[in-house]
Amino acid sequence: MNSTSLYAAIDLGSNSFHMLVVREAAGSIQTLTRIKRKVRLAAGLNNDNHLSAEAMERGWQCLRLFAERLQDIPQPQIRVVATATLRLAVNAGEFIAKAQTILGCPVQVISGEEEARLIYQGVAHTTGGADQRLVVDIGGASTELVTGTGAQTTSLFSLSMGCVTWLERYFSDRNLAQENFDDAEKAARDVLRPVADELRFHGWKVCVGASGTVQALQEIMMAQGMDERITLAKLQQLKQRAIQCGRLEELEIEGLTLERALVFPSGLAILIAIFTELNIQSMTLAGGALREGLVYGMLHLAVDQDIRSRTLQNIQRRFIVDTDQANRVAKLADNFLKQVENAWHIEPISRELLLSACQLHEIGLSVDFKQAPYHAAYLVRHLDLPGYTPAQKKLLATLLLNQTNPVDLSSLHQQNAVPPRVAEQLCRLLRLAILFAGRRRDDLVPEITLRALNENLTLTLPGDWLAHHPLGKELIDQESQWQSYVHWPLDVR
């Protein structure tokens, strides 16, 4: 592999050290290596902000691992940044001097504002949804809050509170008592209060979380079959569960890994404070943050206004998809959706996911015609899809699995991006669009009227169409039968 196409970003965080190695190919990024080590550097800071020898040694040990991977990458294509703990540590110079010797490249201690800006860039390049956003990143010793529109930030704050420092300060007795949570939340709200007005002034349409705490919450919710949106009610529920566990070493929540458990209660307390102080309705997980911001900065790639479209185009190119046919199916599905939207009230994001499924429905053919829907579902489940959340990927895979043949109703109910009923409706529209676009020519798609009354669909074709299309009639009869097996009434006239 040509080493000039390789880039590395290293983030010396207060809780973990991370390394990301990517390959740049035709304007898109392919992840080659992700390494994360819990170093808990912030835990080595004493009251005088002196970093202990043990904490420094843990950090250097980790960097020796990273250094081996960096040898293959040109130095101008490596960025190493240090954040909150090394901003605070009075003896940071000692740590950084040795770190630079180990890595063989410069280590830059960045300001809180620069960290916030890079986090925002990482989110803007990798996360779909509305353009106007609030980004929250809870680190080990600092929390970044950024508002922005598109690629531009409108306000940037780096606050000195984090999941490691709050753990040491409010849960040092390892007690998960209500009082400890109350103290941690109150302290976090006090830190937030001076910046809350400016953040609210700039406003946001979506809120995105980019930290280990949010990642942990996402994993918990997926494991427990909840939808992926984080809400204050869910956070309070998890807090009560933690309090029931009593002690940090006994913390057990389905979906919470042992690795994340130690700093989970302190991160949770900070997040509850942020939700309460800023009146956040819901939050989803970002597709990337600081490291992605560093990589995209080195590549000088512009922020794509529509990340999901870029992702779909890259995948269509890679799997040699017939884009004319994909567009034909998408146009027909959209037409059907418009005809039933008054009855079914499908939200804009659900429409977008249906059209995404249309664009990708034939990728399974790149493996084999036999079992193409299975191949398509497998590929979508395992591909990196910037702009789509894990739950949205699961929905897309489920729709592609059920694009033809008998319907697997349980799979539509197991995804958690949309309610089961909506997943069923999207699946029905996708199947009909694929069926009627089957001859792969615009002029051979009949004029179809679709009406919905609750779950009953009535499909009306031009007068003599069925008589003149015996194969088409056979396919429609088969589809009606398959839909009837799962109690989806389809009346064809």
From Swiss-Prot:
GO molecular function: guanosine-5'-triphosphate,3'-diphosphate diphosphatase activity
UniProt-listed Enzyme Commission number(s): 3.6.1.40
Pathway participation: Purine metabolism; ppGpp biosynthesis; ppGpp from GTP: step 2/2
Uppermost EC category: hydrolase
GO biological process, one term: nucleobase-containing small molecule interconversion
Keyword list, A-Z: Hydrolase
Gene3D superfamilies xref list: 3.30.420.40, Exopolyphosphatase. Domain 2, Hypothetical protein af1432
Keyword Hydrolase: yes
Classification via CDD domains: ASKHA_NBD_EcGppA-like (cd24117)
Pfam families: Ppx-GppA, Ppx-GppA_III
UniProt xrefs under InterPro entries: ATPase_NBD, GppA/Ppx_hydrolase, Guo-5TP_3DP_PyrP, Ppx_GppA_C, Ppx_GppA_N, PyroPPase_GppA_Ppx
Statement: the UniProt record of this protein carries the keyword Acetylation: no
Family statement drawn from the similarity comment of this UniProt entry: Belongs to the GppA/Ppx family. GppA subfamily.
Function, as annotated: Catalyzes the conversion of pppGpp to ppGpp. Guanosine pentaphosphate (pppGpp) is a cytoplasmic signaling molecule which together with ppGpp controls the 'stringent response', an adaptive process that allows bacteria to respond to amino acid starvation, resulting in the coordinated regulation of numerous cellular activities.
Protein name per the record: Guanosine-5'-triphosphate,3'-diphosphate pyrophosphatase
Annotated source species: Salmonella choleraesuis (strain SC-B67)
